[in-house]
C-alpha cells in the first residue's frame, strides 16, 4: 500500500505565476458547475462569504428567493425546525436540489383554476378571496401590492398571463444580476491574489508548465492583497488566514502504468467466489452501497477485484457508468464487528478493474466498497421526455412496455447478487429496503412464491416481471409506484441509469474456498471514513501547518485519484479553507473549487477526493489549505 516513487508524480509547495499558466481554450461549464455557481451567487447576495451560516428563517427565506425559489412557510418550516440553530452553504445547496424553481407552466396552471371566462384574466374580487382564504393565506397589504401592479392589472382584472411572464423575467434578471456580481467579485479576488486567469481552472485540461522553483514554500495569501484597495469587504473579512500550506501533484496522462494490476500466475486453479452490488446516490448527494462479510478458512494468497458491472447488450457500446471509480477496503474482524482493523484496499488498476493481491490469515473480513463521488454525482440536466412504462391492448389488458421490461431485466441483474439467475429472499429484501424501506417477511415471501414463477424457492426473472405488472394493475395502470421504484434504483424519466453504479466483486483464494455474503446496505461513511483516513495517514505525504504543529494535512496519490485528509490533534475545532483554483484538468467530489471544512478536536476527516476530468491528458492538483480559526 506504500506509494511507489514515480517520475511523473511530484509533491511540492510551489505556486505557479500567472505567466506560467496560459489558458489556451475555454471549456463550457457542466450542469453541475452551473448549479453550484448559481447557489454561490444567491448565497453571496445575502452573505459576505459562503463560510457564513444562515442563522434565521428570514435569512433562509431571502437566500432561497435570490436563488429563484418562492418558498412557502411550510417549506421554510421543513428545513428550519425548532431544533435548527444554523445552516451552512452545503445545507443550502442540498435544499436547492430538493426545491425546484416554479415553472411558468405550473404558475399558469394554478391561476387558470380561477379563470372562469378562460380569457387569461381573474377578477380582483376572486383573486382577493383566493389569496386571503385558501392555502397559505396572504395579508390584505400583500394582495393589494399585486393588484396595484400597473403592468398586469386593468379594469378590475388581474392579467395572470402577463404576470407569469413578468414573474419569470424578473427571476431571470435577478439571477443574471447575482451572477454578474459574483463574476465581478471573482475578478477582483483573482486580481488581488495575483491570478489573472479567466474562467474556471477546473475546466482546462491543457498541459501547463510545472511550477517555478523560485517561489517560496509557504503561501501567505495576505501578501497578494492590494492593501490600498478597499472595494472588497469579503476579502478583508475572510482572507486573513493564520497560516497556509499547499500541495502540488502532477500526474501524467492515463496514470502511471508501473502500478498496473496483474493477475497471479495459475489463477485459474484458485477457488473463486463472486458477488454483485450497487452504489446508490441519495438526494443529498450521499452514496450508499452493499457491504459484505468474507470468510477465509485458512491462511492463503488472495486476489480481490472490484469493477463496475456492464449491463449493455450492445457490442462496442459499454454502459456509461464504467468510468466510475470503484475501490474495496478490507477490514479484519477482531472479536466483534465493532473492532475492525484495516488490512488493505484495492489501489492497483487495470482499466476499470481495481484489485489487490496478498496473503490473508484465517478469519472474518469486512469488504466495504467505495467510490470517490467525483464521477458518480447528481445530474442537473432535466429530462423532458418521460418513458412509457405500461400500455393496454385493444381488450383493455395491461402490459409492460418493451423498454420497461428491458430496464426491469437490468434491475434483476443488479439485485441478483450471487448471479445464479434467481432472487432469494435475502436478495429481494435488499431491493425492497431500497425501494420501499421495508422488508418482505417469510409469510409474504410464501405468498409471492405461490403467485409468481419461482425455482428452488427463489423468484425467477419472469416472476419479477409479473410482480411489477401486478403492482401496475393494482394501481389501475397508474405508473406512479413504478416510478418510485425506478428512481430509487437510480433511473431517470428516460429510463437511463444516472444515479447508481452497479459493481461486481471477485475473490480468488489459492488454498481454500472463500465465502462472501452481503449483510448491509449503508452509507459510504462511518467505518469507511475511518478506513480511508487510516490508509491516507499511513501512506500519504504529510505537511504540518506552519506554527500549528497539531494541524496536519495528509495527501495520498495513486494513479487514479488523490485523497486529502486533515488531522486535528488540538483540543479545539478548526476551520480550514481549501482552494483548488489553480488545479488543472481536475474534478473533486465536492463540486466546488473553493470551500471550507470544520474539523473537530482530536479527529481526522476526509477533506476531498480529486480525479482527472480527462484521463487522456495530464492533470495537475494544486491545493492551498489555509487555517481560518
Curated annotation (Swiss-Prot):
GO terms for cellular component: ciliary membrane; cilium; cytoplasmic side of plasma membrane; plasma membrane protein complex. Pfam families: EF-hand_7. It comes from Homo sapiens (Human). Residues 1-25, 195-229 are annotated as: Disordered. Keywords: Calcium, Cell membrane, Cell projection, Membrane, Metal-binding, Phosphoprotein, Repeat. Disulfide bonds: none annotated. One of its GO terms (biological process) is positive regulation of transcription by RNA polymerase II. Residues 7-21 have a biased composition (Polar residues). Component of the EvC complex composed of EFCAB7, IQCE, EVC2 and EVC; built from two subcomplexes, EVC2:EVC and EFCAB7:IQCE. Interacts (via EF-hand 1 and 2) with IQCE (via N-terminus); this interaction anchors the EVC-EVC2 complex in a signaling microdomain at the base of cilia and stimulates the Hedgehog (Hh) pathway. Interacts with EVC2 (via N-terminal end). Interacts with EVC. It is found in: Cell projection, Cilium membrane. Residues 102-137, 138-173, 403-438 form the EF-hand domain. It comes from the Eukaryota. The keyword Repeat applies. One of its GO terms (molecular function) is calcium ion binding. Its main location: membrane. InterPro entries: EF-hand-dom_pair, EF_Hand_1_Ca_BS, EF_hand_dom, Miro-EF-hand_domain. The modification Phosphoserine is found at residues 200, 212. Component of the EvC complex that positively regulates ciliary Hedgehog (Hh) signaling. Required for the localization of the EVC2:EVC subcomplex at the base of primary cilia. It is a peripheral membrane protein. This is EF-hand calcium-binding domain-containing protein 7. The keyword Cell membrane applies.
